[in-house]
From Swiss-Prot:
It is a peripheral membrane protein. The modification Phosphothreonine is found at residue 100. Belongs to the primate lentivirus group Vif protein family. Induction: Expressed late during infection in a Rev-dependent manner. This is Virion infectivity factor. Processed in virion by the viral protease. Highly phosphorylated on serine and threonine residues. It comes from Simian immunodeficiency virus agm.vervet (isolate AGM155). A motif (BC-box-like motif) lies at residues 150-159. Keywords: Host cell membrane, Host cytoplasm, Host membrane, Host-virus interaction, Membrane, Phosphoprotein, Ubl conjugation, Ubl conjugation pathway, Virion. Residues 164-232 are annotated as: Disordered. Its main location: host cell. Signal peptide: none annotated. The modification Phosphoserine is found at residue 150.
Length: 232
């Protein structure tokens, strides 16, 4: 007896094949560089999901997972044999019956909470010395808030939460309590801190792109194009 098909409505973003190929290359790069425990499944490993070309499972420790499903050959009766689409959903590990669709901005914000911190160790040192600028390695993760936090604030959080796991050098220790009586480092920080420096609410993209869901769905990224979400 053949199994009956069960159709499920999903929110998807229709994208070009080259966008998917580019995003997959970015994911492979970061998975190898940072040893990310993201899981990649081919279509033959997802036999129960029709039209699914591949799936990426992104763990969110303590809560659930983000499933990124890439579909192909959708709606053949409409002549869409060579079209591709992307679906993003959150799957709870606490309640296995709960799952919900995600838009790219929300997915990027959730990923940003667990991966790809805003700042680097070098940027923290520059902030402690008085340089003020707005920068983030993953600007797509701040779409919901509309503004990237200042690096001084992020550096303070990193210091308090113990994210800097290396020994403090002499110059770094002297910058904990900046003042005019602390030698060259203190005077330099005091001088730079008084300067009028440019501010911006627009974050710059890093040299190596982050695997953003917005980039995958055809939204604003290096290409600068926008595509509306469509249910297929």
């Amino acid at each position: 007896m053949s199994q009956e098909k069960h159709w499920v409505m999903r929110l998807t973003w229709k994208v070009q094949e080259e966008v998917i190929t580019k995003w997959q290359g970015i994911v492979r790069y970061w998975m190898n560089k940072r040893n990310l425990k993201w899981e990649y499944k081919m279509h033959y490993q997802i036999t129960w999901a029709w039209y699914t070309m591949s799936r990426y499972v992104i763990p969110l420790p303590g809560s659930g997972e983000i499933h990124v499903d890439i579909y192909w050959h959708l709606a053949p009766k409409q002549g869409w044999l060579s079209t591709y689409a992307v679906g993003i959903q959150y799957v709870s590990l606490v309640n296995d019956k709960y799952r919900t669709e995600l838009d790219p901005n929300t997915a990027d914000s959730m990923i940003h909470c667990h991966y790809f911190t805003c700042f680097t160790d070098r940027a923290i040192q520059q902030a402690l010395r008085g340089n003020r600028f707005i920068f983030c390695q993953f600007p797509g993760g701040h779409k919901l808030t509309g503004q990237v936090p200042s690096l001084q604030y992020l550096a303070l959080l990193a210091h308090q939460n113990g994210l800097r796991k290396r020994s403090q050098r002499g110059e770094t220790r002297r910058t904990r309590n900046l003042g005019s009586q602390q030698g060259a480092v203190g005077r330099m920080a005091q001088r730079y801190g008084r300067r009028n420096q440019q501010r911006s609410q627009t974050a710059f993209w890093p040299r190596t792109p982050i695997p953003s869901m917005e980039l995958l769905s055809g939204g604003r990224g290096e290409t600068g194009k926008t595509h509306s979400g469509k249910g297929i």
